[in-house]
């Protein structure tokens, strides 16, 4: 018993020693997500997280808002990663003032009434340096992803592939494509990202770290196209804080 207790204490001490707090803040001209322009204007996105279990697990809080006050979002998330795999669960709550769903009850988790949704994602990044392809499967498991009559969960799913097509002299260019569909049609083909199954997101993102004296400023520009909605968006952003 004494040995077991000592082992538990030693394990806890090891995990604690490896644990780290992280804070990052990004400034973008809009907020883009899976073929959707969630918000426009000057958007501030903040991520505060705690990494433990030797870097394999992360608990985090994510918030976003724009300077006009028309966009407000506050999320919680958990991620587990190792050997190229990463599982994440995001409890997402966008309570923007003009929302057409329940944006007034933060703690309402009733499936028929809630304004939030739970998005679960499994990623895999190939570990070969010569083939760093990223594959991703995301399904909304709960929340405001309902049938037209609000009697069933649609389980809208987004599948995505991304590949770094260029990486040289500090520049990186990532190309990605994503499609969406509902696992449960529940009367029709509409899903969280569109009206029918199909491609809803293509992107080309160019990133580079700018050196300003001793300060490093990661910047990016991204073009995003949604063939299903016949829309396109352009984003410019920078990570202004990374701790």
Identify the meaning behind each predicted range.
Residues 68-160, 189-197, 235:
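Outer-membrane pore/translocation modules
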Residues 19-20, 53-58, 88, 127-133, ...:
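Short loop/turn motifs that connect adjacent beta-strands in outer-membrane beta-barrel proteins
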Residues 172-211, 220:
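Outer membrane beta-barrel transmembrane domains
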């Amino acid at each position: 018993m004494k040995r077991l207790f000592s082992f538990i204490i030693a394990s806890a001490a090891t995990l604690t020693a490896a644990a780290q707090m992280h804070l990052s803040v990004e400034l973008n001209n809009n907020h883009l997500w899976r073929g959707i322009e969630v918000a426009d204007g000057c958007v501030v996105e903040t991520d505060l997280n705690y990494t433990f279990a030797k870097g394999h697990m992360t608990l985090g809080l994510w918030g976003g808002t724009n300077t006009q006050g028309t966009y407000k979002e506050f999320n919680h998330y958990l991620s587990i990663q190792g050997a190229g795999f990463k599982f994440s669960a995001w409890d997402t709550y966008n309570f923007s003032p003009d929302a057409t769903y329940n944006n007034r009850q933060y703690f309402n988790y009733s499936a028929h009434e809630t304004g939030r949704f739970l998005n679960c994602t499994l990623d895999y990044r190939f570990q070969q340096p010569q083939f760093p392809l990223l594959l991703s499967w995301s399904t909304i498991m709960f929340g405001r992803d309902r049938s037209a009559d609000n009697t069933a969960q649609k389980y809208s799913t987004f599948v995505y592939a991304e590949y770094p097509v260029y990486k040289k002299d500090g520049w990186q260019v990532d190309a990605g494509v994503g499609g969406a569909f509902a696992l449960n049609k529940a009367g029709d083909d509409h899903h969280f990202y569109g009206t029918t199954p199909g491609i809803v997101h293509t992107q080309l993102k160019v990133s580079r770290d700018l050196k300003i004296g001793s300060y490093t400023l990661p910047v990016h520009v991204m073009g995003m196209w949604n063939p299903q909605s016949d829309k396109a968006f352009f984003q410019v952003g920078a990570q202004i804080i990374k701790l």
